[in-house]
Structures are given as C-alpha cells and as structure tokens.
Amino acid sequence: MEKTEKNELVRKLIFNPQGDREASKRKIIKGNPTNIFELNEIKYSWAFDLYKLMGFTNFWIPEEIQMLEDRKQYETVLSDYEKRAYELVLSFLIALDSFQVDMLKEFGRMITAPEVEMAITAQEFQESVHAYSYQFILESVVDPVKADEIYNYWREDERLLERNKVIAELYNEFIRKPNEENFIKATIGNYILESLYFYSGFAFFYTLGRQGKMRNTVQQIKYINRDELCFIEGTEVLTKRGFVDFRELREDDLVAQYDIETGEISWTKPYAYVERDYEGSMYRLKHPKSNWEVVATEGHEFIVRNLKTGKERKEPIEKVKLHPYSAIPVAGRYTGEVEEYDLWELVSGKGITLKTRSAVKNKLTPIEKLLIVLQADGTIDSKRNGKFTGFQQLKFFFSKYRKINEFEKILNECAPYGIKWKKYERQDGIAYTVYYPNDLPIKPTKFFDEWVRLDEITEEWIREFVEELVKWDGHIPKDRNKKKVYYYSTKEKRNKDFVQALCALGGMRTVVSRERNPKAKNPVYRIWIYLEDDYINTQTMVKEEFYYKGKVYCVSVPKGNIVVRYKDSVCIAGNCHVTLFRNIINTLRKENPELFTPEIEKWIVEYFKYAVNEEIKWGQYVTQNQILGINDVLIERYIKYLGNLRITQIGFDPIYPEVTENPLKWIDEFRKINNTKTDFFQAKPQTYSKANELKW
C-alpha cells in the first residue's frame, strides 16, 4: 500500500486556541479542535452513547467478589500443574490488557472529536479494570512474594516473552508509523487479541470451574469474557420494508433506530450483523392479558421507562422490574430523518450526518384516501384494466349512508387527479364504478406496502392514515379504561404487518389477535390500536427463564436501540454489543475495498494462521497435558475452531476446513453469567450454585 502524507495520522495539540468550536466542524482525526470538551453539542452521538454504556452500564468492581475460598483451594486443592498454569495464564493476561490500555491511549492522542475521545477513554478504562481484575485475583490468591515472581515471569520464561511480543509489535509499528496500512494491521491484531489470544487461558479457568475449583476466579473471568447478546430465532426488526426477520435482512436494508433521549426514530444502516449458534439461558417477558411477549438472551438490554418521571434507561432483560410504574416502550416517533455514516470516514474525519428527507409527507392526499377505501370495500376489475381506455376500473358498493357520503366527498376531492366515477342505485345500497387513470404514479392495489414508503411519511401522516383506516375497515370501541383505542381487522397478513409497522413509527401501541374460521381460507387479524399509549406496563408481566439451543440474531446501530417484533409483539430494545474491531473490519471491507489489497488480504490470512499456531503452542505449554478435562488435542482443535470462526466473521474462508465442530461446546454455556444474581442497590454480587454447574 502506497505510503503518502495524506495517509498519515497526526497527533493533536493539548491546547489549541485557534481551534474550531463548532460541532459541525469536528472530525474524528485530522481535525482542528481547541481540545476543550464542549459537550453542549454532540456530533457523534453513537460515540457518546458508547461512552455512557461502557462508562456506567457495563461495569463491575473486582473487590465485590470474595476470593478467600479460592486462596484456600489454591493452597490445598490445586495440583502443582494446575498452580503453574494458573500463574502463567494470569501473568500473560495481565500483559495483554496492559498492551490494550496503551494502544487505546495512543489512538486517543490523535482523536480530534471530544465525544469520540471520551468513548476511547471509557474503553481504555475498561481494559485497565480487566488488568486490575487479574492483579486482584493474583494478589488475593497467592502470597505477596509469589505474586511478585509471577509479575516478573515474562523476564524469565522465554515462551511467555515471545508471546508478549506477537501483538505488541503490531501496536508498536502503528505507533511508529500511524498510517492506514498499519491501522488495518493493528485493527486485525486487536481483533485477534480480543477474540483468540485470551481463549486458551479462559478455557483453562473454565475447566477448573467446571470441577468446582477456583469458582470466584472463574466468576471474574466471566465478567471479562462477555459475548454478543441477541434475540431468539423468529424475531423481526423494523426496516424501511416493514418488519423483516433477522434471517432475511439484506445488505441495503435501513433499520429503525430509537433515540432514548428524545423518543424519536430514524433510519440507519446497521454497522454489524450477528448470527450465531447459542446454547443456554433465554429470558421471556410476557404480558398474558394482551398476549405480548419478547424473548432474548440473558443480559440483552431493553428500554425501561419510569412512568412517574418519564425517564428511560437500559436494563438487562433478567433484571427488568415488574411493577406499576415501570413500562417498556413499544413505539417511537418518526420525523423523517436518516442517520448516514461511513465507518472509514468516521476514522478519517467526515463523521455521521443526520439528514431530513425533503420528500416526507405530513397529510394524506385524496388519492391515498381512495386507496384506503379500496383496501377495505373495493375490488379491482382485472378485465377492465385500461389497456385501451387509459383507465383502470374499480368497483365499490355501500349500504350505509355514512360511508356513501364520505366516499363521494373523497371522489370529488380526487377530481383534479383525473378520477371519474359513476354511481348506480341498488335496492340495498349504492354501487360505484371509479375510473382510475393509468398514468397516475400510484397504482391501485389492495396492499398498503405497494404504495406507502415508510421513509417518506411522518408521525402526523401516520395518525391521519389510522384515523381514515378505521372509518372503512374498523371501528372505535369504548375502552373500559377510557383510553382512545381504535380497532382494525383484515384477512391480509401483509396489511396487518404494515399497520403494525406504521403504528410503531407513529407512537402507538398495537395488540394483535387472530380469529380462524374453519370455513375461511385466511384467518382474520384483529388489531387494537392505542393512540395515546406508546408503552406497555410491566406490572402484570411474567418473567421466565428457559433453556434454548439454536440460532440467535441481532444488529448494531449508532443509537444503540432498535424496534423489534416477536409473534406480533412490538417493543424497543437495545441492540447487541459486539466486537468493535470486528465491525470496523467488516465495514471497511464493504465500503473501502481498495484498502484490502491482495497483499493485505494475504497478510491477514497468514497472520491468522500464525496467531492460531502461537495460541495452540501456548495453551499446550501452559497445561502440559496434565489438566483434568483438557488436553493437547482438545486445545489444538478448540483454537483452530475459534480461528475458523473469527476469520469467517470478517468475511474470509475457514483456514482449517477439516475442523467443523467445537470440541469444547460446554464452554459456551458455562461462561454465561446466568448463575450470578447482582443486587444493584447493594452492589454486591450474590452467587447461587446450580445443579448443572458440575455436569460433565
């Protein structure tokens, strides 16, 4: 890759009086900041959200986990081989996260947008907490003299010294020459470090924990070794096409993201997609009265609203409180905005822009009203399609004077569009033939999704649409709680799905039921639309934990929150938090393929092979084939399996095609934090042993 001054990354000044104050002029790098944090305006909201997530949500204190029992077991239960491995692994893990802290610090010195620098600082702090956690484990379990020896192992153990150099050299080269090529290489190095280089050590700790040994050490590792948090198979996400199953998402799909600060919905392209195998605990929140439910992996965050204050926050699904003043939002307010970004441009300074589409509509047109009536009470005459006359004929019949008067009012409003019509009196009502010009841009159809574009409408348009809809194909019942509620019914699943999507964008809760007639081809879908409610109360909900084995899915968006639907139940939920550097790599490969030259792609594959071999040798060296439950063969196959998994997750072919199964499947379940219940008011983890904790 050509090295030019344009590709060099420059460190910012500590204080720059001539810098730009305006948020619109901020750049991730190569900007001109004063370097004074002025956060009254935020340009990169995704970074500020990430800062708050890492700084305040995903946090624990190592001292909260008592290590006394582990100290006793280290002295009396562990074999000499287990002690040696325990010490070597901790020494190595301390080094790895020490490198991470400095690597992020070097990045931060060149970042020129304050909110982005804060996010990097938060991640740097998390890595320092990891390093401190390893140190806390070490000094809690072994005596001070021995702990000092373990810190110094890298000077005495040549294998450990070489291990420390592997990733460190990539980071050092980036520091020496901070250009695009070295950025990609450092990114790959970071990805390998986080997703591969910890794992033989983690496998050793989990093997001990599986035998009931050093369980508090293992609990610390579980907090560090968190995985993606996802939705169960069958969950859908709201896109510009409507609700789409995660399995059917296209690369060009824009999804609805929710701003927790404003309650507004905008469209954006996901910057990460997750599809993976999962085996372990799932949680279901269910509202029996309305048949509303949602299912997600343990730890997946949902938006929770305090009904007294109106404030919203994120809580893991297993910790959502079920009481009268707690609610889960199920809809937002779409204002016509699209959040656009290019991840490489984020790094090079162009950032995220929020644009309002000029084509958005605030009011229904007469033609749109006519199409709503067509869906409810009309038919399209397929034989009189206007091939020779230029007019498609539509047929209507009404017996109620209310509908007759309203329909003729709409027809008169449609006259400027070239609509013509005739009416015929019948014994039981009035029939109409409407002549619909073929040259109108909107074609007559019985399906809403063929003429409504979700990105071209606003909340005002949606509410007017719903008002018009229930005039023709529904009614306004009297709710016992005196809430404003509409009722709509249809036999068309497409229309049911689309109305739910509209209501989710228009700030309205929906409840769906199905009534199947044995004599009818299709069931009748009944939708109750609560115009004044955009949430569902948790008071009468039921929370269930159950075992699940199968696929899970999710996406990641800049705002961190998405609109999902499961079994016709809509809600706002947090998206998954996935490996940052994996997302950077994947997005760069799509948006900036020129950076991934054949030479760079060859280097990535070869470096992955090298890293896998180094991790295998390290794991075998540490365990010496003397640890019950894990041996050299298992380590080799496990690390090769992870190597295949990690490299395919960034778009490359498996490097070990002969390895297709995870030989240590039990780790994926064992490492979940589902046997630790944390009381956040007391901030003290309480661990409850489960019967399956020692299963083999």
Curated annotation (Swiss-Prot):
Positions contributing to Fe cation 1 binding: 97, 127, 130
Primary role: Provides the precursors necessary for DNA synthesis. Catalyzes the biosynthesis of deoxyribonucleotides from the corresponding ribonucleotides.
Sequence ranges assigned to domain DOD-type homing endonuclease in this UniProt record: 377-507
Gene designation per UniProt: nrdB
BP GO terms, sorted: deoxyribonucleotide biosynthetic process; intein-mediated protein splicing; intron homing
Record PTM: This protein undergoes a protein self splicing that involves a post-translational excision of the intervening region (intein) followed by peptide ligation.
GO molecular function: endonuclease activity; metal ion binding; ribonucleoside-diphosphate reductase activity, thioredoxin disulfide as acceptor
Keyword Transcription regulation recorded: no
Record-given protein name: Ribonucleoside-diphosphate reductase subunit beta
Signal peptide (residue range): none
Family matches, as InterPro entries: Ferritin-like_SF, Hint_dom_N, Hint_dom_sf, Intein_C, Intein_endonuc_central, Intein_N, RNR-like, RNR_small
Source species of the chain: Aquifex aeolicus (strain VF5)
Pfam family, one: Ribonuc_red_sm
